[in-house]
Every structure is written in C-alpha cells, then in structure tokens.
Amino acid sequence: MALETRKPSLLSRGVRALLMWFYRRQGWTAYGEVPEPRRFIIIAAPHTSNWDFVYYIGLTQSLGVTPHFMAKTGLFRWPMRNFMLDMGGVPVDRSQGGNYVQAMIDEFAKRKEFMLTIAPEGTRGAVRKWKTGFYHIAMGAKIPLVVGMMDYAKK
C-alpha cells in the first residue's frame, strides 16, 4: 500500500484555508514544538466527533505539520477520493485481512518525513479498549509516539 505523493488540488488548498480560518475564528491557538526528525505517530484520542477533523487540520496547519491520518476506505470513494488523499488520508479497509501495520512500517522506512495520526479507538464511539496497531507500527518503524491534547476550555 504505497501512498501517493500528490500536489494538493486547488479545492483541498481552499478547504484547508477555510478550516484554518474557522479554527482561528473559534479562538484556537496552537502551542508546542514539533519533534525532529518529523517521523512519528501522533495519538489522537479521544476521537468523539466529526469536528475533530476540523480542529485537527487547524492545529496541524498552525504548527506547520503536514501529517497523514488513517481512515476507513469508504471515505475514499468517488467523488471524495482525491480530496481525502490531498488532505493526508491513508485508506484502511477494515473488512480485509491486510497487514496495515507492516504497510505503515514500510511507509516510514521509505520516507525521511512522515507523521501519521491514529485514533486508537478505531471509531468515533466510546470504546473500552484501544486497538494496538499504533504501538506495533511505532515499535516496528523505531519511531516515537507523540501525544498532544486540545484543551476545549482554554482553546
């Protein structure tokens, strides 16, 4: 599963600009340092709302990060496929028995810079236990796990 290297379309650049405007308009400010080298997994939890994506794009743009994220294959169907890829999406077909852990380890090995965001719950709903693929990818690729947070009260 080699990821496509894409030049973002005018649509995706426009959507990023709009989401960035919305992020700032809501009063959000990003703080922190991005680890170097820029090869790591970002743990995004809890993932509870579709709004998480809007704030995620604003946060990463504010920090100058172009991360990738894993999302279910259904989000990559026409007409959304190119847009999702432009936004950094990595399609994951959960109905197939593919080894996405190894595919992501291989992707990290090919790139000097690759930041992958994973919601360890694997869904927006509440779960009792996280999936462990993020850990196995990090160990196999010998990269750090980065934990960030969004303080909704202080923005």
Whereabouts are the PLM-identified features?
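Soluble catalytic domains of membrane acyltransferases
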Residues: 3-8, 25-155
